[in-house]
Amino acid sequence: MGYPKAFTSSDSEPEPDLSRDLGNPVMGNPGVVSRSSSTVAQHSVRNNPTGPDGRLAGLWNARALLRFPAEVNGVRLDFKSVSSRRPTSRLSLLPYSLCSICPSSQATMTSKDHVKSQIPRLSAINDLHKIWPTVEEHGAAIIESFLSLDIVRRLNEEVDPFVKIEPIPAAKTKDHPNHVLSTTTRLVNVLAPISKAYREDVLNSKVLHRICSDAFHVYGDYWVLMGAVMELAPSNPAQPLHRDMRFSHPIVEYLKPDAPATSINFLVALSPFTAENGATHVILGSHKWQNLSNVSMDATVRALMNPGDALLITDSTIHCGGAETTGTETRRLLTITMGISQLTPLESNLAVPRPVIESLTPLAQRLLGWASQRSAAPRDIGLLTIRGNSIEKTMNLKAEQPLHDDEAEPLCRETI
């Protein structure tokens, strides 16, 4: 299977309708910001194939906005002047209130004519030892053949029925609705009871565990913070540039800039990732940035991938999903957010039927929170213990037991 067509300067994507809230997955409940027409005029599609403002620069959030000059009710924003008003963490881009905006501020944006470095591509088979050092250096790497095509096929088949009927993330029927994902996105997590490929192949992937061991050894055990299939419908809007974990774990904002990553994200292509259907934008090296005043879409490169390839990024790598511009293609991915077990997962596997859990390997059980955890502390006393004993010992938890299809049904039925 050949690689998707490269993204060139002749490719173009339509300008967004900034008159409505597109429900992006980062900005929460943003207001609408209008771009200066003069700014638009200065940046043609030819010189800026991704759009002068990153397509969704109009979405506003006073804390997480990763954009450059725009207007809010006629007031022009300038990131250099705004971000210098007060000390901020490495992730806080603007002051908490709009009172610090300087109406007279002006900033310019120039197209970069030099050839950009592309995302490093490594083989899951031949370059395993290079993957994490590469991500540490560049903030991202594409792992070719992270999952085999057979696993991709089976995983897609197993999750299909659930993706088709999943309500939108912000559905009123949910008591913890997600208002930061677009209404054209479907997300299905807690995959263990509904996908044999996930619970047997993905959770026991030697490639995944080698990378996680390399990344998290200074902290101790790690587990799945979320494993989810995301499907993005035709014409799905682009996301704003962002860093992960900022709408669930604000503690990461208070870590030292040089602290080792506490979580990483495998974005596994379950369908082709092309420039036209919204392949992820990444800013290489941005995981080391503290000054975010000049973040722009001009600095991004695209993660073009075949099914089974994975884009690996850290929780500080600036990235975003691109816009689907064909109007006909659906893009699907498996996002596996792995993190140290000192962080609370975004998903809960407590409702997974015990027969399903007992069919797993001990390693997979630990990843889903059905085993006690250990830190790298010299005198570690353990995490998730019961009066000094492990979960698995106290509950007499078995492992690698045969599983009949009907034993996974309770949660599956409830999910449907």
Curated annotation (Swiss-Prot):
Q: In which pathway does it act?
A: Secondary metabolite biosynthesis; Alkaloid biosynthesis; Mycotoxin biosynthesis
Q: Name one GO molecular function term.
A: metal ion binding
Which amino acid positions bind Fe cation, per UniProt? 242, 244, 319
Which top EC class is named for this enzyme in its record? oxidoreductase
Tell me the InterPro entries matching this sequence. Answer: Phytyl_CoA_dOase-like (IPR008775)
The UniProt entry's GO biological process terms, in alphabetical order, are: biosynthetic process
Which Enzyme Commission numbers does its entry carry?
1.14.11.81
Known catalytic reactions: (-)-4'-methoxycyclopeptine + 2-oxoglutarate + O2 = (Z)-4'-methoxydehydrocyclopeptine + succinate + CO2 + H2O; (Z)-4'-methoxydehydrocyclopeptine + 2-oxoglutarate + O2 = (-)-4'-methoxycyclopenine + succinate + CO2; (-)-cyclopeptine + 2-oxoglutarate + O2 = (Z)-dehydrocyclopeptine + succinate + CO2 + H2O; (Z)-dehydrocyclopeptine + 2-oxoglutarate + O2 = (-)-cyclopenine + succinate + CO2
**Region: Disordered, residue numbers:** 1-53
Entry keyword set: Dioxygenase, Iron, Metal-binding, Oxidoreductase
Q: Does the keyword Ribonucleoprotein apply?
A: no
Cofactor(s) it depends on: Fe cation
Residue ranges, compositional bias (Polar residues): 34-50
The Swiss-Prot or TrEMBL record describes its family as follows: Belongs to the PhyH family.
Question: What is the role of this chain?
Answer: Iron/alpha-ketoglutarate-dependent dioxygenase; part of the gene cluster that mediates the biosynthesis of the aspoquinolone mycotoxins. Within the pathway, the iron/alpha-ketoglutarate-dependent dioxygenase asqJ acts as a (-)-cyclopenine synthase that converts 4'-methoxycyclopeptin into 4'-methoxydehydrocyclopeptin through dehydrogenation to form a double bond between C-alpha and C-beta of the O-methyltyrosine side chain.
Subunit record text: Homodimer.
> What is the name of this protein?
Iron/alpha-ketoglutarate-dependent dioxygenase asqJ
Organism expressing this protein natively: Emericella nidulans (strain FGSC A4 / ATCC 38163 / CBS 112.46 / NRRL 194 / M139) (Aspergillus nidulans)
Q: Name the gene.
A: asqJ
